[in-house]
A protein has these predicted regions:
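A generic local secondary-structure boundary/capping motif
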Residues: 12, 64-66, 90-94, 123-125, ...
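A contiguous loop/helix-start segment that scaffolds small-molecule binding in enzyme catalytic cores
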Residues: 20-21, 98-189
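Class I SAM-dependent methyltransferase SAM-binding "motif I" and its flanking Rossmann-like core
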Residues: 31-99
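Conserved active-site and cofactor/substrate-binding residues in soluble primary-metabolism enzymes
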Residues: 2-6, 29, 33, 57, ...
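Short beta->alpha junction loops
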Residues: 1-3, 79-81, 139
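Class I S-adenosyl-L-methionine
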Residues: 1-50, 61, 156
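Predominant activation on well-ordered alpha-helical scaffold segments within soluble catalytic domains
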Residues: 9-12, 35-39, 60-64, 118-121, ...
Length: 189
């Protein structure tokens, strides 16, 4: 972290020399990835063509492991305050909770932000029931992958790290066979 601009400039400089260059990042380059920054830096390299190739982001990868939590409207929110002030993150959490979105949290904890998931859960519980179905997936598609389904009040005291993606259900989300499922609203089911 913190050397992303340098990586982008280096990629463009190498491309300027006639090389074919790839910028690799985890997940999907267009979801908390490098695609936006590549376009921003690319303004200074108008002769270089960019192609963004989609990947599998933690939200969709983790959702598949948990069951089907993202079947209805949802939002992604990063708890990292490195590039976004906490006040803005807090406002987004409250708005998402009030609107009854399923919320997928990225970057739920770090050494400096060990209590941010607790803060996020407290904010969510202003509009969501403590019994809201939630889930976590750690090390998605890696060795040591783990998934857990729990309530929002249990999530509040769950230990997570930067390799964990957190899913907070909406008022319709339920647990089915230890999987997290958000109904789409089909009748007669």
């Amino acid at each position: 972290m913190k050397k992303e601009v340098d990586r982008c400039v280096l990629a463009f400089e190498e491309a300027k020399k006639g090389k074919t260059v790839s910028m690799i990042c985890s997940g999907d380059a267009g979801v908390y990835g490098m695609a936006g920054l590549m376009y921003e830096v690319g303004v200074n390299y108008p002769e270089t063509e960019l192609e963004i190739i989609p990947g599998v982001t933690a939200a969709t990868g983790g959702a598949a492991v948990l069951g089907a939590p993202l079947i209805h409207d949802f939002c992604l929110i990063s708890l990292s305050d490195l590039l976004t002030p906490w006040e803005k993150i807090e406002a987004r959490l409250l708005a998402a909770a009030q609107a009854d979105f399923v919320v997928c949290l990225y970057n739920p904890s770090s050494k400096k932000r060990h209590d941010y998931l607790q803060k996020a859960c407290d904010l969510m519980m202003k509009y969501k029931s403590p019994d809201t179905i939630c889930g976590t997936v750690s090390n998605i598609a890696r060795d040591g992958e783990e998934a857990h389904v729990m309530t929002l009040k249990e999530l509040r005291d769950t230990q997570v790290d930067m390799f964990t993606t957190v899913f907070i259900g909406n008022s319709q989300t339920k647990e089915i066979s230890n999987k997290m499922v958000t109904p789409r609203g089909y009748r007669n089911v």
